[in-house]
Amino acid sequence: VSSTARGRGDVYKSLTKAALAQALLLLRTALELGYSEGCLNSKSFQSHQKELESFPELISILLNEKSGFMRNLARITSSVQNWIFLGCGIYYPVAMESALKMKEVTYLHAEGMPAGFLKHGTLSMIEESVHSLFFVPPPAEVDLHNRTIIAIEEIKTRGGTLVGLYFEGDSQAKSLLDHAVELPPVPFLIAPFVQMILAQMFAYYTALDLKRNIDKPRNLAKSVTVG
């Protein structure tokens, strides 16, 4: 959130903490259920717990190391009027949340879509002026990674502009993307959350570049009171 939100209390209308907190709570619940039902053994459960406990420190490091890269990416692309955010599997809701934040604070057109469904109409939108932002899973998540790379190649073949967040060691994604930010290796469990936070940062810096009122986006209320 912006300095206004930090300095004067929670006045920010487009909350980044809500989606992240809900997703992490759901993950913690799933881990507890998995352990209690015998789907996870004690060793796996404790390992995942340690990964989650390391998350705040990891995010602090990433924010310090990658904020400059995200700011630079925002400056390069802030004139883009149309965005498609794409991810496979668990990265699809990450794409949805990230597209929502982009449209809320920048007033640009942004849609979150599943990367595996491009041929169901989405490809007709592809042209150089439409930028596609991909959330690329770690290469070790073989199935999700392969499906994401196929989608990237389909858009590249049709002349679309490709932006992406990918993890260190992914030479395949690096060679295909026009603009990209490389992330350090992280546990599979928290990889989607890392990308979500950086995408929220990308929306923030894009809004700053466009001189939007980030704390109070136009036409938005703190809570929705009507159906």
Regions found by a protein language model. Give the residues of each.
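A SIS-like phosphosugar-recognition module
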Residues: 2-3, 13-227
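A short, hydrophobic C-terminal helix/tail in secreted or cell-surface proteins
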Residues: 6-9
